[in-house]
């Protein structure tokens, strides 16, 4: 049987997700970065390989149980996302002169019979409201909904102003002002493809549920007259029927055809509306002749235009905006600037190293070992394989902090990066010498318990501050590498579509 999941369901999911960041007991989310090593073909301990694409063309992340675990293997660090970093967004549509914009209609997709019997589509060919180009953002960062496009003409006059009434421009377009992107929203929630969407309280308060603004002519009809028999003129006080009250229109005739319909009294409470031919003919100054007109009364969204801009513009997208500032020095310096990253993740409710719910602003996700100053250690290089004598442990260097003699590393399930000669991932431990396989650098772990540069070492070793395999990874993005620097800031905008 035919069925759909409605846009209201999508909107409900988006609202629940957005609210989860700031409700009384919020869900905790972290943005994670990972994958310091290059993409390519990885060898497993059983001699089989896993293909993950190339540096310039990584594969699309898999949504398998295997990948759920793998994504933690090369995680580098994570930063907490707060409610102020979250906003509803919609696809960005800049106003451009010479463009013919679609109009808002309540009946896109619907099959309505008449002189023609086809589904209602937009001028652009879009078959749904939210696929149509019915709103724009101007250079002043004002957002307007297009109510009328002057019979599918090009827009040449950029709308301006913040009036709560319909704005008519010199090109005869009719616009409804919705909201303005604040300076903060422009900085945080405006990208090449998306823009923040909020409901303006003044516009919302002025909205009238079921009030009417537009009537579109589907078929102009013929032989209409005004009183006295003239075939050109205006018939006034034509009632609009339906479930609302008070709607009145005037009808303009040219050579017996209806060429314009203007709402003179908007009325209220309409969820459907009609202008009947009999009411046109019966109007006080009508001539009593004419037939064949088909007029579409455009019904506003629930609450009226501007009552809820987020829903009206299709805000079932949520943007998460996170800024990474160098090493995040003000947050314990958990983000390395000595290596690059190729993977972005969204992690829900992870645990810290102690197994409790994570709450810190940032979390290191790599392992670390404190190297003794004597004998003098060598200089390990990022991305090289490291081995430990005695244990046979294998890892891959993320960063060598020569100032504090801290070696940061990861251990994955693959050869040369975590799997040892027996095919196991063995933990580094004790005072056994660690050797870099490319640099030939050596270092002896300092097995004392201490805190150095905000890193807590127990018997010389520090586990990741973000407990691997805890929480849930909701989003994964593989991308070409992003090189980092201490004086560099990355602004990462994730857009989740519901």
Language-model segment annotations:
Residues 1-209, 294-296, 304, 351-362, ...:
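Tryptophan-rich substrate-binding surfaces of secreted polymer-degrading and adhesive proteins
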Residues 169-498:
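Conserved, function-critical positions that sit in or immediately flank catalytic
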